Amino acid sequence: MKDLLKFLKQQHKSEEFDNIRIGLASPDMIRSWSFGEVKKPETINYRTFKPERDGLFCARIFGPVKDYECLCGKYKRLKHRGVICEKCGVEVTLTKVRRERMGHIELASPVAHIWFLKSLPSRIGLMLDMTLRDIERVLYFESYVVAEPGMTTLERSQLLSEEEYLDALEEHGDEFEAKMGAEAVFELLKALDVDADVAAMREELPSINSETRRKKITKRLKLLESFQLSGNKPEWMILTVLPVLPPDLRPLVPLDGGRFATSDLNDLYRRVINRNNRLKRLLDLAAPDIIVRNEKRMLQEAVDALLDNGRRGRAITGSNKRPLKSLADMIKGKQGRFRQNLLGKRVDYSGRSVITVGPTLRLHQCGLPKKMALELFKPFIYGKLEGRGLATTIKAAKKLVEREDPEVWDVLDEVIREHPVLLNRAPTLHRLGIQAFEPTLIEGKAIQLHPLVCAAYNADFDGDQMAVHVPLTIEAQLEARALMMSTNNILSPANGEPIIVPSQDVVMGLYYMTRDRVNGLGEGMMFTSPDEAEKAYRTGNAELHARVKVRITEYDVAEDGSKTEKVTLTDTTVGRAILSLVLPKGLPFELINQAMGKKMISRLLNACYRTLGLKDTVIAADQIMYTGFHYAMIAGASVGIDDMVIPDAKKDIIEGAEAEVREIQEQFQSGLVTAGERYNKVIDIWSNANEKVAKAMMENLSIETVKNRDGEMEDQASFNSVFMMADSGARGSAAQIRQLAGMRGLMAKPDGSIIETPITANFREGLNVLQYFISTHGARKGLADTALKTANSGYLTRRLVDVAQDLVINNEDCGTFEGVKMTPLIEGGDVVEPLRERVLGRTVAEDVLKPGTNEILVERNVLLDEALVDMLESNSVDQIQVRSVITCENDFGVCAKCYGRDLARGHMVGHGEAVGVIAAQSIGEPGTQLTMRTFHIGGAASRASAENSVQVKTTGTLKLQNAKFVRNTDDKVVIVSRSTEITIIDDQGREKERYKVPYGAILTTDDNATVTSGEVVANWDPHSHPIVTERQAKISFADIDDSNTEMQQDELTGLTRIVVNDLSKANAKEPKLILESDEHGLQEIRLPSFTTIEATDGMQAKPGDVLARIPQESSKTRDITGGLPRVADLFEARKPKEPAILAEVSGTIGWGKETKGKKRLVITPKDADAYEEMIPKWRQLNVFEGENVEKGEVIADGPESPHDILRLRGISAVSNYIVNEVQEVYRLQGVKINDKHIEVVIRQMLRKCMITYAGDSNFLEGEQVEVSNVKIANRELEKQGKIPAQYETQLLGITKASLSTESFISAASFQETTRVLTEAAVQGKEDELRGLKENVIVGRLIPAGTGFAYHQKRTARKLAERQAVEELSVSAADAEQALTEALNAEVMDTPSSDE
């Protein structure tokens, strides 16, 4: 029977569980796991190497050392399986049971579990409502604690020192009970009545007023309730039995020379056992109290060290002064169980080697060295050799392969055919870092890689290595071929643009062959077809660049795939005609009838993919690459020093700039400008000079003048190699050429501030020593940045993956009507991202109407593809409401409609797509790229000169958005609001440009005026912020005296002005201007530090007059150094140091009573109580008394805090803010990421909410819960007609969000393992295994991708089983009832016997 049970037990498949529960182990449970008590500290006998009986490696407890053999050797072999040897007591079985059988130690005295004691907040402390220090004093035998006060005046859980205890004993005798050590805490915990406490606290909560007490009680209530629900008992936090880990998980290995290598755990266990045995002996001997106490304390310390060494006091060290690795250390950190063995495993059948170029490969191929292939495909080769009859056994096959017989190679060819291999390059930053290829066998020892996939791998051939993996099973091969093949990964998942794009030499070749040249050989010829043009080129009758006419045949591809011909005589060049021969039919010739730079080639491949599909694109990409390589060779473009032409104008520009700088310097010395202004202006002058030199140089390089056929002079694009390389996008940029042939310009110090002496030389002229020395700053900073930021970026990616890993596409449509509003993104007047790019591949949330009409252009829930976007653009739609993952209403995962297009495939996203991980990779991957690319411009300061005007680029109508303005004495408009924008509207009513104009800007035209291109419409001073009067008023000074201001004379004009001193010094009064006007009464304006006062005391001010100017700070350069940490700050939702102050309510601004160092801001709404806020005096406010503000408007400048935006402006505002800020950082680096990915992460950051009103739900006020849980609970409550809970969404940083996920397995494997597991155990948490990480850890298919269907089937099967069981139980109940009725009837019928 036992064997049968065993057999059944083995049959049970391990993955058939639905969730994992973690809890506290009760002593009985620990004993039930155990196979015997470990009584001795001995490990193995050093002579025989056999484990000692009852020791830490005892074979009787843990199982045999050799398979099916008992320790003394009486029973050997399989036939005795299951026998227990009567001599040595060992069960005859497999030795691997030594990995799973546990033992236990019966502790002579209870011991507190350090995790529940010291892991903050201390669970034991919270349970007993005592402080951690008090509990520690009891545990480590410094104080007594009252366990049972009896009829005395003492309180339960009161602490008594030794003297107090003796006094109490004298006074009360044995009426009370006080103890020390873990027994005392054990008794206290055991005496707790959890149910009664919970009920009492629930009643008490509503009546509590103090916030701190309420918080504390809520915390304790949550803890007690979790004990109530989980079935854990509080006293189980104190150990009375200690489990012992199976011996094979803490091995002891004999080294040669009689020494042993052992796991640290064995040392820790030995200490525990030694101290425990000593304590038992002392107790038996009834030793004096003080000795026993000391021994108990040592036992407590030994168990602490075993569970978590170093958590309390000094870590216990081994013989080599290194802290011992405890159980907690085994599971946490990069080398711990989770990250080392469960999430990352080494794989079989893999190899690695250096990579080289394979320019002749097709896109789906890679070159695999024969040696590697032979090794990797061994099992397949053995099988084939046996199947062919070339070898009789595996051994013979092995011999054949080792001898490398000729037939082995034939078999290898056959095995490899159609069997894809995976190539991976570390670091794998996104999913394109592992792709599948078909191997072709090559001689040599280096793997050959197709040049076009280098971009995806970020690989180059300067010694990079790659790993090869072999997918073994049919399913794996199928997935490799269908999903991972390089030919299936043409589009980048980050932005949906082709990632298989030619670069470098290929671009150079294509650019060279598609350029035109004036008066080239063969100009003006006519050809009947591109083939004829090619013949003319091959025979030397025409050159590549000759301008000719060619008859071009184009094919229009219809929807059904049929092609119609169209023939036109086109002006083109010979080279372009030749290029048209390699393109697939169906692409318009105009795509290549131009000089093909990198952007154009990318556009060409994109068009090809969208119109002709995958297969043609792959073929085209290969053909384009071969052609490019060929013509790059023919071009033979090389760079000589004479190619870097220095412009003649450079000398004059630099002299002019130096003169301007001298002038500024003189003004500074005569006190006209402050040091900061001088610095800013000098830097502006040099930035402008640099731009001018660069412009002159590029004009010089890019155009040359030649004679045409008629003997006239004509301009044409230059054939200078340096220019061609940069212009085509093959290598280098204008910024780099500027350093070669213009001037190096301004350099930055390592701290980011700009050195004001520029490097006027360039690399062709050479730098002198000082210039070279200044340059080294930037170069070194670049290298240092690289090293640091690679790690930072990797960590950011890890956090992103962790927070987003469980977001999977779950269903088709969640049915929401919500969405986000999309408008074109405008920065600095330019449209940086047109609407079409932002909405492409999104689903429309509500019908899109034609502007000004009710005509529906696109209905809701339609996916916008290229054609629809073009249609919307031609109808000049300027805003669209689209579905977004942020507003998706699925409880778990997101729906396909809210996500939209799968960027890497170009169609609607499929079910089971792991959009979270893709998003994390798309954001993280360029982060690493950026950090590796800081230093290419060698730290040259790339700071735009400060803007001081708005110059319009297009002709149209000027409109002011949310403007407040006054007219000054010259009848010009002066802006007096913070959020004014100028927009330029064209004749179709489309917004063409948008500019922010600052407070105090003066407009040259009026609202709704017509402006022409190039006109300057607004001016302001970029270096200072003016204070402008809005009405006629009399000015008087208040608190302006020598203590806080000083006079400064302007030597040019002889005027004196008052400048405010630094007010951050102690008790400085704040100077004010008082404005007195008839209709508005008094208004005061406070002046911050360093303000220059332009008004005079007692003057009559007109509207638009400038009363004072506040200087602006000088600017630092923006390197991505600001970039990566900035992105991390945004995703971590960190509060900035001095955040902008936002208005908490809408209303009128006023001032209240001041206190030390702070002013009191009062906002009075129309119909509610005034809101007050204290603001530090030194903060510069944007608002004046009497102004009206809207809720969420900026009152004091500074970086905005996302938490404030969420609280005051809502979810859509905060998501817009984060998306735009993150995008700005990436855009600065020229990286494109789709907004979707950032939204996915934001959705995860907004998962939690704070309960503001509990209603009839089980939540507590102030508790933090998952939004989805509240929604589910509220739906239930509404069904029952009860009051739902109300909540406020909270924004969590990605680290916090990952740690507070529902799944404790996922959180524990991320960070802070101890804390997460402690919390989960106390709450008796269940992990539903919803996310990807949890499933990887328990060793199942993940519920995404191809595993999605498996999991769905499993759930369906479980449901069916459950229903079947219910039906069965119902029918069983029916049967039972019928039976009882039948029996009763019989009883009634049987005649009674007494008759």
Curated annotation (Swiss-Prot):
Recorded catalytic activity of this chain's protein: RNA(n) + a ribonucleoside 5'-triphosphate = RNA(n+1) + diphosphate
Entry's cofactor comment: Binds 1 Mg(2+) ion per subunit. Binds 2 Zn(2+) ions per subunit.
Pfam families: RNA_pol_Rpb1_1, RNA_pol_Rpb1_2, RNA_pol_Rpb1_3, RNA_pol_Rpb1_4, RNA_pol_Rpb1_5
GO molecular function, one term: DNA binding
A Gene Ontology cellular-component term: DNA-directed RNA polymerase complex
Binding locations of Mg(2+): D460, D462, D464
Cofactors: Mg(2+); Zn(2+)
UniProt-listed GO biological process terms: DNA-templated transcription
Gene3D superfamilies (alphabetical): 1.10.132.30, 1.10.150.390, 1.10.1790.20, 1.10.40.90, 2.40.40.20, 2.40.50.100, RNA polymerase II, clamp domain, RNA polymerase Rpb1, domain 3
InterPro entries named among the record's database cross-references: DNA-dir_RpoC_beta_prime (IPR045867), DNA-dir_RpoC_beta_prime_bact (IPR012754), RNA_pol_asu (IPR000722), RNA_pol_N (IPR006592), RNA_pol_Rpb1_1 (IPR007080), RNA_pol_Rpb1_3 (IPR007066), RNA_pol_Rpb1_3_sf (IPR042102), RNA_pol_Rpb1_4 (IPR007083)
Keyword annotations of the record: DNA-directed RNA polymerase, Magnesium, Metal-binding, Nucleotidyltransferase, Transcription, Transferase, Zinc
CDD domains in the record: RNAP_beta'_C (cd02655), RNAP_beta'_N (cd01609)
Residues that coordinate or bind Zn(2+) 2: C814, C888, C895, C898
Enzyme class, broadest EC rank: transferase
Assembly notes: The RNAP catalytic core consists of 2 alpha, 1 beta, 1 beta' and 1 omega subunit. When a sigma factor is associated with the core the holoenzyme is formed, which can initiate transcription.
Stated family: Belongs to the RNA polymerase beta' chain family.
UniProt xrefs under HAMAP family: RNApol_bact_RpoC
Function recorded in the entry: DNA-dependent RNA polymerase catalyzes the transcription of DNA into RNA using the four ribonucleoside triphosphates as substrates.
Protein name: DNA-directed RNA polymerase subunit beta'
Lineage, uppermost ranks: Bacteria, Pseudomonadati, Pseudomonadota, Gammaproteobacteria, Alteromonadales
Gene assigned in the entry: rpoC
